[in-house]
Curated annotation (Swiss-Prot):
Organism of this sequence: Crotalus durissus durissus (Central American rattlesnake)
Name of the protein in question: Snake venom serine protease
Keyword Zinc tagged: no
UniProt GO cellular component terms: extracellular region; secretory granule
Subunit structure of this chain's protein: Monomer.
Length: 262
């Protein structure tokens, strides 16, 4: 019954969530059905939609600003219509049993420490279209080509929604490139700067919480951006997962009092 309600709401969200969500993939193409096995669809029952990343059978990584109500996690999703009609047999749905946000996060700043761990109510089964993604062993270097993916808008500011996840390749830049485009960013930050300087490709409304993948590891989390997506000379900041690996591993190990780096 819960899944039926979720799928019905997803139909409504296809028409309405652009006004309520935060980031999507612009300038990409439909992802290959086999390349997004770790991509989670994070549905918040208040009507907000995010992406997420499966990092082991029981845990999903997403953005802290996606914490806007009770959460359902769908894995193995490709074409939303197939899920809604029951054609897709590889989809698994889980309830968020626990949610963990950095206890030292600034409560009045959604951009601060924008990372959240979701523990699902039961482990997922690894399958053809569901598998976890590795945490980073090292941070990505400037110039790296990385992959973003999600169900977010594919045009901006006039929103077009795809119904399938879209993927795009973007580049890692020095953090100062993002600071030049967004002076409100702090002098130092635990974020990655990524995008295309010419514009035309990037995350946008609806992709929040989704992954920035470099060399088969989750290196970033879609966090926030401008009013119009994928603008020239305006790469976007992504939460830098490498800086939070110790916190992530501590929480998963049962140390729920662990704090994030300042």
């Amino acid at each position: 019954m819960v899944l039926i309600r979720v799928l019905a709401n997803l139909l409504i969200l296809q028409l309405s969530y652009a006004q309520k969500s935060s980031e999507l993939v612009i300038g990409g193409d439909e992802c290959n059905i086999n390349e997004h096995r770790s991509l989670a669809l994070v549905y918040i029952t208040s009507g907000f939609l995010c992406g997420g990343t499966l990092i082991n059978k029981e845990w999903v990584l997403t953005a802290a600003h996606c914490d806007r109500g009770d959460i359902l996690v769908l894995l193995g999703v490709h074409r939303l219509k197939d899920v809604q009609t029951g054609v897709s047999k590889d989809v698994q749905t889980r309830v968020a049993k626990e949610k963990f946000i950095c206890p030292n996060r600034k409560k009045d700043d959604e951009k601060d420490k924008d990372i959240m761990l979701i523990r699902m109510d039961s482990p997922v089964n690894i399958s053809t279209h569901i598998a976890p993604l590795s945490l980073p062993s090292n941070p990505p270097s400037v110039g790296s080509v990385c992959r973003i993916m999600g169900w977010g808008a594919i045009t901006s500011p006039n929103v077009t929604l795809p119904g399938v996840p879209h993927c795009a390749d973007i580049n890692i830049f020095d953090y100062e490139v993002c600071r030049a485009a967004k002076p409100e960013l702090p002098v130092t930050s635990r974020t990655l700067c990524a995008g295309i300087l010419e514009g035309g490709k990037g995350s946008c409304d609806g992709d929040s919480g989704g992954p920035l993948i470099c060399n088969g590891e989750i290196q970033g989390i879609v966090s926030w951006g401008g009013d119009i997506c994928a603008q020239p000379r305006e790469p976007e900041p992504y939460t830098k997962v490498f800086d939070y690996t110790e916190w992530i591993q501590s929480i998963i190990a049962g140390n729920t009092d662990a704090t994030c780096p300042p």
